[in-house]
Every structure is written in C-alpha cells, then in structure tokens.
C-alpha cells in the first residue's frame, strides 16, 4: 500500500502544479537623458575648491535674468566642482546670457578653472595652470 499511496500523492501533487505561464520581467524605461543646456557654466578646481566669488557673481546675475527659465546644478568632482545648465528660450537670448557670464569669468586664475559655453562649442574660459 505504501507504493500505491506514494503514487496517488504524486499524481495529486502533479495535478495541483501551477499551469500559469511565466511572464517576462518588465524592464524599466530607460533613464531620461538630461536635456541639452542652452548655456553651460562650469566651475572647476585645481585642488583648492571652486572660485566662490565668481559663483556668487554668476548666481546674483542669474537671479535677476528673466531670459533664463531654468537653472539646473550638476555637481561633479570631489572639491565641490559643478556645472550650471541654463535653459533659455531663444538662441539670441542664450548668446546674450553667454556673453554676459563670459564677461564675469576672469581671464586668468591659478585657483580654479571656470568656463561658459554654448552647444555650438563656443567657450569662454579662464587661463590657468596649463597656460
């Protein structure tokens, strides 16, 4: 009887097995690519931190600049380096903002490299240790 009981239990267990078809695991949507910046302002460091005075000047200008609709701070590095990604509605306005911030960037700095650039690649930057 024991073999018969085992056979019955085995048949019952097989009959109770799930017949559901496994579904593929859904993959998450790809991460959103950051929107292109109309103007990018970069604050770097030569080992002494970013140029805080310049950061304050640029932030003060941006606080009163109506043509800039969005400022996205993108940190990187280990010494508080970061980029500001500026959104400006019109290309002509972006160029004006670019030139105004470019006028704030010092021509030379042995402390911290800073730059402002347009998507076209046009850039105004400090000359520093490598120059």
Where are these regions (language model features)?
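Short glycine-/aliphatic-rich beta-strand segments at the starts of folded cytosolic domains
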Residues: 30-47
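Short, intrinsically disordered low-complexity segments
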Residues: 65-100, 124-127, 131
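A short amphipathic beta-strand at an alpha->beta junction
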Residues: 109-124
């Amino acid at each position: 009887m024991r073999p018969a009981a085992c056979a019955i239990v085995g048949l019952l267990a097989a009959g109770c097995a799930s017949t559901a078809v496994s579904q593929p695991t859904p993959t998450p949507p790809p991460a959103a690519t950051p929107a292109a910046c109309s103007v990018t302002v970069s604050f770097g460091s030569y080992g002494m931190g970013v140029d805080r005075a310049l950061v304050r000047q640029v932030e003060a200008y941006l606080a009163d600049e109506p043509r800039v609709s969005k400022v996205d701070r993108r940190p990187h590095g280990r010494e508080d380096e970061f980029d500001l990604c500026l959104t400006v509605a019109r290309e002509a306005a972006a160029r004006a903002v670019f030139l105004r911030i470019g006028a704030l960037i010092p021509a030379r700095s042995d402390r911290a490299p800073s730059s402002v650039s347009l998507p076209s690649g046009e850039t105004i930057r400090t000359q520093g240790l490598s120059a």
